[in-house]
Amino acid sequence: MRRILLSLLIAAFIGISLPQTSFAAVRTIELIEKPHQLIDGKFLNDDLATLLAPEGRIGSLVFTPAPATTRWVIDGSFLDEIAAMADGYELADETDGQGVEIAAAFLEQLKIATAGAEVTSIAFGNPDLILAKQLAPSELLFYFSYGAERVSFHIGRAVAIDKSFSNEKRSKVSGLLRKNYTINRQAISKLSTVVTAPELQLFRARLAILLSPSINGDLSERFAQSAVDGVAAERAKLRINPGKYALTSETVDVPLTLVNGFDSAVTVNLIFRASNIKVLVNDMRQITLAPNSRTQFAVPFTVVAAGATSVNAALTNSKGQWLGPSSQLALTMTLIDSRVAWFTTGAAVLLFIGAAAQTYRRVRKGRR
């Protein structure tokens, strides 16, 4: 009997001594959603506006008071989508979205709801971590860091990175779409070596969505095509305008226009590849183009022989990697021998003098 009483007293003492918070369960709220915005920026539909409303499935998580022990796990890509809505957005059917005010209210309430709570971010776009490690392990590190940067930006404070979070589902993206993802990622990675503009960093990160387990089948095809179109648009921002030129002397300065459509300055190399040896031209190194600019350069070409030729001009980074497709310069060379030129010029001068003399004689004769 004494042993039973002693055990009860010890149990009661332990229960009184331990802090009550140790028994409080930590609630985890995940703000992770399948993508509603295509890579090119348009929204598939307006379903997200309904989800973000205070009574919606996602909105209720933020607008309903949460205990202080709540842990928030957030995808920065999802918050970027909501921010895009708050700025005004367009749907894929080219109509305007109706969730601008709802999105803005959600972001403001999120700052209040997460104040003082534990917040962790996952890889931007919630990609399949196993697949991402297989296809691009270094890019996965970028997805983690960029995801934390975006979550921190939206809630106004630093957050931790959760590299262990992963969906139970696996991505079912096909082998062809995996290859397309790799090609698109490599194209944007090359551009990123010379372009530091935020819009390109965002586009680079959004490619992670292609590896998300939440998009499969027809939806993955649609996102893949959106990525292809988006990559083409990004590469076209940095280009050389094509043109046709007639060269009539041995050395000619050909005016080429280089376009930089990004919000940051870039430094590139301009290289040339002629289809034959009828013309000679040297590459131009370390050319700096101002943000959102069209810059014209006079490039000296040396004509070796008459005829027609084409020259492909391309922009590269310091490693010699092409930053986009080349532009074709169509050249027509008509060499005029210097002796023929002097003879033609002399004949023209003599004809002019003869015509002037004849006019003078007619004037004098008329006065008489």
Predicted regions and their residues:
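N-terminal membrane-targeting/anchoring modules of bacterial envelope and secretion proteins
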Residues: M1-D253, L258-V259, V268-P291, T295-A298, ...
